């Protein structure tokens, strides 16, 4: 079924304005990674608040091309942006943690520090400007829990949280975003050479097809269900015991 992207854009922009007003906030900001999800969200917040929207680029031992792409997106949208380099804070924290750890730290435990430092940075600016933080998670990532708890999952609003990754690509084309950004291999930038699909072992297209139709290989179905089970804790507020 053909999607009416003009209608969806208007609905999302109005929703962003409404939620921002409800929070008595002044505007919106987003972390710009150089990827398609953040590019789409940046477009939406710019449309919602042309003068009170901000992109924040936060390299952290990242691929330099990602920062270039993030700047390109901001310039393409005429979106105000700032760059906060997190190399030194990350290095200092990792050094302290390694010194206190009696064994070799888990790779993912160290990698997840990056999105958590970015979350802290976003909320620093949000508090200073009275803005809300717009997250970049899409439906596919949310369904399988492919995000860092209290990292990229730590946001106020998820404007594309009801769109699969495949739909985000289609939306990006409708919005006229640079083709380089749309065709770029999705990556969380957790370590050098990391890609989402390489880490998962499945393509977003196949995962989306299963999420929308219930059809997929036995291996894919097992992967999705396993990820959903493992990530339930990410989607809940902290539990409180009944006394």
From Swiss-Prot:
Entry binding sites for deamido-NAD(+): 116, 149, 156, 233-234
Biological or metabolic pathway of the protein: Cofactor biosynthesis; NAD(+) biosynthesis; NAD(+) from deamido-NAD(+) (ammonia route): step 1/1
Coiled-coil regions listed in the entry: none
Positions of ATP binding: 31-38, 136, 165, 187
GO molecular function: ATP binding; glutaminase activity; metal ion binding; NAD+ synthase (glutamine-hydrolyzing) activity; NAD+ synthase activity
NCBIfam families: nadE (TIGR00552), PRK13980.1 (NF010587)
Biological role: Catalyzes the ATP-dependent amidation of deamido-NAD to form NAD. Uses ammonia as a nitrogen source.
Homology family: Belongs to the NAD synthetase family.
UniProt xrefs under HAMAP family: NadE_ammonia_dep (MF_00193)
Protein name in the entry: NH(3)-dependent NAD(+) synthetase
Gene: nadE
């Amino acid at each position: 079924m053909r999607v009416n992207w003009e209608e969806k854009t208007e609905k999302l922009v109005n929703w962003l304005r409404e939620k921002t007003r409800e929070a008595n906030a002044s505007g919106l900001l987003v972390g710009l990674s150089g990827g398609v999800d953040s590019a789409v969200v940046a477009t939406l917040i710019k449309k919602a608040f042309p003068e009170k929207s901000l992109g924040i680029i936060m390299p952290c031992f990242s691929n330099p091309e990602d920062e270039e792409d993030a700047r390109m997106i901001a310039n393409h949208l005429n979106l105000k942006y700032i760059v906060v380099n997190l190399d030194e804070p990350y290095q200092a924290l990792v050094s302290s943690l390694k010194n206190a750890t009696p064994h070799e730290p888990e790779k993912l435990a160290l990698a997840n520090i990056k999105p958590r430092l970015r979350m802290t940075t976003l909320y620093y600016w949000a508090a200073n400007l009275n803005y809300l933080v717009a997250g970049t998670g899409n439906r596919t990532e949310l369904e399988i829990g492919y995000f860092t708890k209290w990292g990229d999952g730590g946001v106020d609003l998820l404007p594309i949280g009801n769109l699969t990754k495949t739909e985000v690509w289609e939306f990006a084309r409708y919005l006229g975003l640079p083709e380089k950004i749309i065709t770029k291999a999705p990556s969380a930038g957790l370590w050098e050479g990391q890609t989402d699909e390489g880490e998962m072992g499945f393509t977003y297209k196949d995962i989306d097809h299963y999420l929308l139709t219930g059809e997929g290989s036995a291996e894919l179905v097992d992967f999705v269900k396993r990820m959903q089970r493992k990530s339930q804790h990410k989607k809940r507020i902290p539990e409180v015991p009944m006394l």
